[in-house]
A protein has these predicted regions:
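Small-residue-biased structural context
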Residues: 1-231
Length: 231
């Protein structure tokens, strides 16, 4: 049976996060002592950090409360939701710890490497946990209107950084997926994506010298409305 709710873009966000986690892990395992120097100026770290905060913030604000109400009287499922919330908190704390370590010149490189490893492992495990355990609950109890509301909240949070997060999201996406994401957006936004945002993103060496950068998918503009912006 097919899913009731359209979650393709949510999976696309997860895939993009996994792509960046692989890049972050590659930087951390180079073993040449450059981790702090690379991450301090890495656009990839800033994009990963921002994408996690946008995505998790939208879930905390507009998805978990809906699930908590719908799952009242189901202690096992509520315990799963509490685990999701705890994982978000832990990931946020790890991001903060990495940033603090990057800001301190005397940070032990081993400590920084351990923090990055914990973040890569923690986010990867959270994405898997969410897809395997929480998404089926979302499909079972969240209404189409509630899901649309979550998408709108997510859209508002991403809109301010659409010039970077949209090409980041579509990096490596196939043509069908990219077309589906872009089609609902206003024409000026699609044009800005094609003519400015995607070329600027493609020119970034997101993770610094010596780190492979995935090939990207082959001034102000109107901000997309919440219903139109990607989730």
């Amino acid at each position: 049976m097919s899913d009731r709710l359209p979650m393709e873009t949510t999976y696309l966000v997860h895939d993009a996060l996994r792509r960046e986690l692989r890049q972050l892990a590659a930087v951390a395992t180079r073993g040449d002592g450059t981790l702090r120097g690379v991450l301090r100026g890495a656009a990839g770290w800033k994009l990963l950090r921002r994408a996690l905060r946008v995505h998790h913030g939208a879930e905390d604000a507009a998805l978990w409360p809906v699930l908590r109400h719908a799952l009242a009287g189901r202690p096992y499922d509520l315990a799963l939701l509490e685990a999701m919330e705890a994982e978000h908190t832990a990931i946020g704390s790890l991001i903060g710890a990495v940033d603090e370590a990057l800001a301190e010149p005397s940070t032990d490189p081993v400590l920084l490497g351990d923090l990055v490893d914990a973040l890569v492992t923690g986010v990867g495990g959270h994405l898997r946990h969410e897809e395997e355990s929480t998404f089926p609950l979302v499909q079972a109890v969240v209404t189409a209107q509630q899901w649309e509301r979550f998408q709108q909240v997510h859209a508002r949070r991403i809109a301010a950084d659409a010039d970077r997060l949209l090409p980041w999201l579509l990096d490596g996406a196939d043509e069908r997926t990219a077309t589906a994401v872009l089609a609902p957006l206003p024409a000026p936004v699609r044009r800005a994506y094609r003519e400015r945002w995607r070329p600027a993103y493609a020119a970034l060496d997101r993770w610094g010298p010596g780190t492979p950068v995935p090939a990207p998918a082959p001034t102000p503009v109107p901000t997309p409305t919440p219903a139109q912006a990607p989730t």
